[in-house]
Amino acid sequence: MSQWAVPVTLKKEETMENRIITISREHGSGGREIGRKLAEKLGIHCYDAELIQRIVEKSGYPADFVKEKGEDAVGGGISMLLVDRRLGPTHQDTLWKVQSQVISELADKESCVIVGRCADYILQARSDCLTVFIHAAFDKRVERIIKEYGEPEEKAYRRLKDKDKRRMAYYNYYTDKKWGNALNYHVCLDSGELGIDKCVDVLAQLY
């Protein structure tokens, strides 16, 4: 891990009454929809867009910056993360620290579903947290992107390649773990094969 990456202080509490589910996902796998539907089914809060807003309020950074740079590397990958730190910590490093604080505070406050933003790593010391990774075959993710954004196939293909590369670089850098590695999560589900609703049902049974 880079010397400029802000370490997360993880303390395992003696008693934890809340139950947290973190949803990490490949772009185009439907992880955000799964998180939303799961929270509705369980009657708990899903932090996705609202999480971004809370980070905006606490950090003072613009919403677009928080949304894009809170889980994706700037530019093309790990090299940009390293180059940007020649003069010291970057705004992305500061954002990482604030983001970690907000996620930890939410987990302390209530049972909830948290989508993305390395929440699985940030909350890894908690015994009340179930970490999930949602994935799907590349062609099925392309189909979903085309349907969701109305993009031509070639553009959807490029979008996924770029998003995967930047998200992986960000996660690997700040957590010192490999994004998408099954060993980093309690549950990995293929939404392309199972479908959105089946993934929701499986996770609800594990809650």
Which residues make up each language-model segment?
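Short, Lys/Arg-enriched N-terminal segments with co-localized hydrophobic residues
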Residues: M1-T15
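Pre-Walker A (Motif I) flank of P-loop NTPase domains
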Residues: E17-I21, R25, E110
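Glycine-rich phosphate-binding P-loop
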Residues: I23-R36
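Short beta-strand-centered segment that lines the nucleotide-binding/catalytic pocket of NTP-utilizing
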Residues: H45-V56
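ATP-dependent small-molecule kinase phosphotransfer cores
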Residues: V56-S111
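Small-molecule kinase domains that catalyze NTP-dependent phosphoryl transfer to phosphate-bearing small molecules
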Residues: V74-L81, D93, P152-D197
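RNA pseudouridine synthases
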Residues: L106, I122-R126
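Conserved phosphate-donor/acceptor-positioning beta-strand/loop module used by diverse small-molecule
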Residues: A125-E148, E153-K163
